[in-house]
Swiss-Prot record:
<dbReference type="GO" id="GO:0006612">
    <property type="term" value="P:protein targeting to membrane"/>
</dbReference>
<dbReference type="GO" id="GO:0002230">
    <property type="term" value="P:positive regulation of defense response to virus by host"/>
</dbReference>
<keyword id="KW-0564">Palmitate</keyword>
<dbReference type="GO" id="GO:0000139">
    <property type="term" value="C:Golgi membrane"/>
</dbReference>
<dbReference type="GO" id="GO:0140374">
    <property type="term" value="P:antiviral innate immune response"/>
</dbReference>
<dbReference type="GO" id="GO:0005783">
    <property type="term" value="C:endoplasmic reticulum"/>
</dbReference>
<dbReference type="InterPro" id="IPR039859">
    <property type="entry name" value="PFA4/ZDH16/20/ERF2-like"/>
</dbReference>
<keyword id="KW-0256">Endoplasmic reticulum</keyword>
<feature type="topological domain" description="Lumenal">
    <location>
        <begin position="198"/>
        <end position="230"/>
    </location>
</feature>
<feature type="transmembrane region" description="Helical">
    <location>
        <begin position="231"/>
        <end position="251"/>
    </location>
</feature>
<feature type="domain" description="DHHC">
    <location>
        <begin position="125"/>
        <end position="175"/>
    </location>
</feature>
<comment type="function">
    <text>Endoplasmic reticulum-localized palmitoyltransferase that could catalyze the addition of palmitate onto various protein substrates and be involved in a variety of cellular processes. Has a palmitoyltransferase activity toward NCDN and regulates NCDN association with endosome membranes through this palmitoylation. May play a role in cell proliferation.</text>
</comment>
<feature type="region of interest" description="Mediates interaction with IRF3 and STING1">
    <location>
        <begin position="198"/>
        <end position="412"/>
    </location>
</feature>
<dbReference type="GO" id="GO:0018230">
    <property type="term" value="P:peptidyl-L-cysteine S-palmitoylation"/>
</dbReference>
<feature type="compositionally biased region" description="Polar residues">
    <location>
        <begin position="389"/>
        <end position="400"/>
    </location>
</feature>
<dbReference type="GO" id="GO:0035591">
    <property type="term" value="F:signaling adaptor activity"/>
</dbReference>
<feature type="transmembrane region" description="Helical">
    <location>
        <begin position="177"/>
        <end position="197"/>
    </location>
</feature>
Amino acid sequence: MDTRSGSQCSVTPEAILNNEKLVLPPRISRVNGWSLPLHYFQVVTWAVFVGLSSATFGIFIPFLPHAWKYIAYVVTGGIFSFHLVVHLIASCIDPADSNVRLMKNYSQPMPLFDRSKHAHVIQNQFCHLCKVTVNKKTKHCISCNKCVSGFDHHCKWINNCVGSRNYWFFFSTVASATAGMLCLIAILLYVLVQYLVNPGVLRTDPRYEDVKNMNTWLLFLPLFPVQVQTLIVVIIGMLVLLLDFLGLVHLGQLLIFHIYLKAKKMTTFEYLINNRKEESSKHQAVRKDPYVQMDKGVLQQGAGALGSSAQGVKAKSSLLIHKHLCHFCTSVNQDGDSTAREGDEDPCPSALGAKARNSRLICRRLCQFSTRVHPDGGSMAQEADDAPSISTLGLQQETTEPMKTDSAESED
């Protein structure tokens, strides 16, 4: 069932993807749960019902003492019979809208929905496929390809849509199945405990007088007695108990869920739509959250700062060497100039003047070399000073984290 949000449309009978397979709606609208094709969930349901009924009334209830045996037949038989009736009614009822049932010919094929002509299947309470006016809570089911009044959901276990016409029969089916599972578990546990404590209590039927072996048991009493060994009874009991427990868990959850829906005055369809809207709003809120964007910006800034910090360290080192060289050369030049002036007064000026000129020449070449190695040392050093350090990034992140926590608490 393809559900779509909207006030007038729930399901569009178009080709949809289900488990990566293209699923087309049936061309002929389905009348009820017995319309072909039958769903394999429906077949499994009836097979389990027949199997559990046979095991309950044919194997385990005959093990009970006479006083408990007749009570179990009445109580368990009443629950199973009630379940059978409501299950059949829920499957046989046509849950379609009243106008659909009056005006629709189920033998005629349904047209395919053309979205280029209409945005939704149902618009202004008119179905463009069924060609009838429907109620406000009517939805068009893709599995049945018809409008269902008071649409709740399409149940694969009864192979029919659940709407306002058959909802309470469906609810009674789930409730009676849960009650029957509980009765069967109680009977199985009693038989198991008595077999471990006092097996003779389970052999009260008069036909056991002819059975001498204590490991031989009679099944399907009193109509068709069949002698089997203890191992066979234990295997059947464990399988039935496991199947009963799994069914009870599934049916119990389903029953509690529908009790919750009735308390909230909602349908299954409305519950699913509301959940989808809440999830969509949460995703949009996360995308628009400024604190999430701030955290991403801080991380990006931190990654850039690490690179710029490394460049800044190199720039500062080269600039420091450049400054020391120039300072050294300046001091040497000054010493050289003074030495040269003293050399003019010295009786041997030629030797001292030559040394001064050589010193100045060496210093000039060193300064030129350092300038070529790092011509933009000043600008890179300034960039390194302006780049945020690791401690600064940590302070920014610690500052933003409490703000994000407060925002999350306010949203909750």
